[in-house]
Amino acid sequence: MSAPRIGVLALQGDTREHLAALREAGAESMPVRRRGELEAVDGLVIPGGESTTMSHLLKDLDLLEPLRGLLADGLPAYGACAGMILLASEILDAGAGGREALPLRAIDMTVRRNAFGRQVDSFEGDIAFAGLDVPVRAVFIRAPWVERAGDGVEVLARAAGHVVAVRQGARLATAFHPEMTGDRRIHRLFVDLVTGVV
């Protein structure tokens, strides 16, 4: 079987780190900035960044509705931090003044932006992750958390009593940044979701 082609939405965030992590996890990876690139991938990573800015870049580049359509048609997706926020069906504290974060509605969950606090409240720690024997080193930067996980959404990890990782079908989301550590198990899990191994 050939390696899946997985795109990384390259509007903001740790694009290079995600591209490298996906390659190390066995995928062919490519940056995605245009509709044609979006339509050429088997799966998509939405990295961290600023969710309101990313939403409006998607809109300005005419990617928002095509991406929503591809997700509705079943495109596998993984969102980290701001990516988790965007994959949600509902966003709390989404922003104001016409600059709100816009939900892609790919995972049936309600996510609260910046739930763990501001930049100064960023932290890291080891957390248990469903299906993995050894805890994951999780880096949280102005991280969200999941306030509601819908039916069919599997909770994969918690931190400080809050849900910070979920899966729904071939959709994965984490409130933390696995690309910032050398641990490739989260990216490998997403590659397996794209190829249908899990």
From Swiss-Prot:
PROSITE patterns: PDXT_SNO_1, PDXT_SNO_2
Assembly: In the presence of PdxS, forms a dodecamer of heterodimers. Only shows activity in the heterodimer.
Name the record gives this protein: Pyridoxal 5'-phosphate synthase subunit PdxT
Metabolic or biological pathway: Cofactor biosynthesis; pyridoxal 5'-phosphate biosynthesis
An annotated Gene Ontology molecular function: glutaminase activity
PANTHER family noted in UniProt: PYRIDOXAL 5'-PHOSPHATE SYNTHASE SUBUNIT SNO, PYRIDOXAL 5'-PHOSPHATE SYNTHASE SUBUNIT SNO1-RELATED
InterPro entries: Class_I_gatase-like, PdxT/SNO, PdxT/SNO_CS
Listed GO CC annotations: cytosol; glutaminase complex
Gene Ontology biological process terms from the UniProt entry: glutamine catabolic process; pyridoxal phosphate biosynthetic process; pyridoxine metabolic process
Active site, UniProt feature: 81 (nucleophile), 177 (charge relay system), 179 (charge relay system)
Reactions this protein catalyses: aldehydo-D-ribose 5-phosphate + D-glyceraldehyde 3-phosphate + L-glutamine = pyridoxal 5'-phosphate + L-glutamate + phosphate + 3 H2O + H(+); L-glutamine + H2O = L-glutamate + NH4(+)
List of residues binding L-glutamine: 49-51, 113, 141-142
Protein's job: Catalyzes the hydrolysis of glutamine to glutamate and ammonia as part of the biosynthesis of pyridoxal 5'-phosphate. The resulting ammonia molecule is channeled to the active site of PdxS.
Family: Belongs to the glutaminase PdxT/SNO family.
Keyword Glycosyltransferase: no
Keywords, sorted A to Z: Glutamine amidotransferase, Hydrolase, Lyase, Pyridoxal phosphate
Cited Pfam families: SNO
Keyword Lyase: yes
EC number(s) given by UniProt: 4.3.3.6, 3.5.1.2
